[in-house]
Amino acid sequence: MLTRQQKEAIVKEMTEIFKRSSLALFADFTGFTVADLTELRSRLREKYNGGARFKVVKNTLLTLSLKDAGYEGYEEFLKGPTAVLYVTDGDPVEAVKIIYNFYKEKNADLSKLKGGFLEGRKFSSEEVEKIAKLPSKEELYAMLVGRVKAPISGLVFVLSGILRNLVLVLNAVKEKKSE
């Protein structure tokens, strides 16, 4: 049993985390072994180096923390055993992909991913799959660079073709005059 001071410290810590987080995803963790949850945490640690965590916290403490952090509409996520995946540093979509794929690999009920908040916007359990299928920030940057680069490459190709044709015409004129 936690003392009042310990509970207050947890609420304060989680409030600060929720204020800084780009993602707070709530999940029912029942049915997983300790080894399973350790594996999930190691995947997050490997990708985020501490910028994302999967933490089990009592619902009453989460309620106080979310309220203090200014969130609204979280009550539906805090029914039954609940853990929270939060991201304070890095791409939040990648974290959703990691937990979504983890639940899929373990044949867990995907509705156990209850929903949460992404960049301050609330999302439901049904939207978790859609978020997991979004491209990561790196992929979006690569797509953007490709789209910007394509017209420039086309322009360079056209201009080089014009120069090539000019050289061919000049060579033809030179040969004609030398005859």
From Swiss-Prot:
<dbReference type="InterPro" id="IPR001790">
    <property type="entry name" value="Ribosomal_uL10"/>
</dbReference>
<keyword id="KW-0699">rRNA-binding</keyword>
<dbReference type="Pfam" id="PF00466">
    <property type="entry name" value="Ribosomal_L10"/>
</dbReference>
<dbReference type="InterPro" id="IPR002363">
    <property type="entry name" value="Ribosomal_uL10_CS_bac"/>
</dbReference>
<dbReference type="InterPro" id="IPR043141">
    <property type="entry name" value="Ribosomal_uL10-like_sf"/>
</dbReference>
<comment type="similarity">
    <text>Belongs to the universal ribosomal protein uL10 family.</text>
</comment>
<dbReference type="GO" id="GO:0015934">
    <property type="term" value="C:large ribosomal subunit"/>
</dbReference>
<dbReference type="GO" id="GO:0006412">
    <property type="term" value="P:translation"/>
</dbReference>
<comment type="subunit">
    <text>Part of the ribosomal stalk of the 50S ribosomal subunit. The N-terminus interacts with L11 and the large rRNA to form the base of the stalk. The C-terminus forms an elongated spine to which L12 dimers bind in a sequential fashion forming a multimeric L10(L12)X complex.</text>
</comment>
<keyword id="KW-0694">RNA-binding</keyword>
<dbReference type="InterPro" id="IPR047865">
    <property type="entry name" value="Ribosomal_uL10_bac_type"/>
</dbReference>
<comment type="function">
    <text>Forms part of the ribosomal stalk, playing a central role in the interaction of the ribosome with GTP-bound translation factors.</text>
</comment>
<dbReference type="GO" id="GO:0003735">
    <property type="term" value="F:structural constituent of ribosome"/>
</dbReference>
<dbReference type="GO" id="GO:0070180">
    <property type="term" value="F:large ribosomal subunit rRNA binding"/>
</dbReference>
<protein>
    <recommendedName>
        <fullName>Large ribosomal subunit protein uL10</fullName>
    </recommendedName>
</protein>
<keyword id="KW-0687">Ribonucleoprotein</keyword>
<keyword id="KW-0689">Ribosomal protein</keyword>
<dbReference type="InterPro" id="IPR022973">
    <property type="entry name" value="Ribosomal_uL10_bac"/>
</dbReference>
